[in-house]
Amino acid sequence: MRRWEHYEHTADIGVRGYGSTLEEAFEAVALGLFDVMVDVRKVEPRECREVEVEEEDLEALLYSFLEELLVLHDMEGLVFGDVRVRIEKTENGYRLKAKACGEVLDYEKHEPKEEVKAITYHDMRIEKLPDGRWMAQFVPDL
């Protein structure tokens, strides 16, 4: 089961996602990112976008994935309330394919909170927990 939470981090806010798989943890942290900006429970899956990134390690993969979602937000005004991820190991690292569904930001409906300026590597961690779940976290630039 995927879930996310926000955690306090000096002047900013951290985003932490959990899942029973690595993919679910990536999905949860992506939803947590958008929940920093809007109430994702109010986002309907009216439009979907596909994202594909390849990187040498998991941290770079998470960074590039979240960056692609943020670019879609900045360029098309989209906010996402559902994200599905597939990650596969490749010869040179990892490949991620994702389908993100949401809608164009509506200020009345979605009640914007914070503006995320950029994805960062700050406090980024991806690990398998002792209970077998996966956790992924980072601190966005607000």
Curated annotation (Swiss-Prot):
Pfam families: Archease (PF01951)
A molecular function (GO) term: calcium ion binding
UniProt KW keywords: Calcium, Metal-binding, tRNA processing
Membrane-spanning ranges: none
Positions with a binding annotation for Ca(2+): 12, 141-142
GO biological process: tRNA splicing, via endonucleolytic cleavage and ligation
Purpose of the protein: Activates the tRNA-splicing ligase complex by facilitating the enzymatic turnover of catalytic subunit RtcB. Acts by promoting the guanylylation of RtcB, a key intermediate step in tRNA ligation. Can also alter the NTP specificity of RtcB such that ATP, dGTP or ITP is used efficiently.
UniProt similarity note: Belongs to the archease family.
Entry protein name: Protein archease
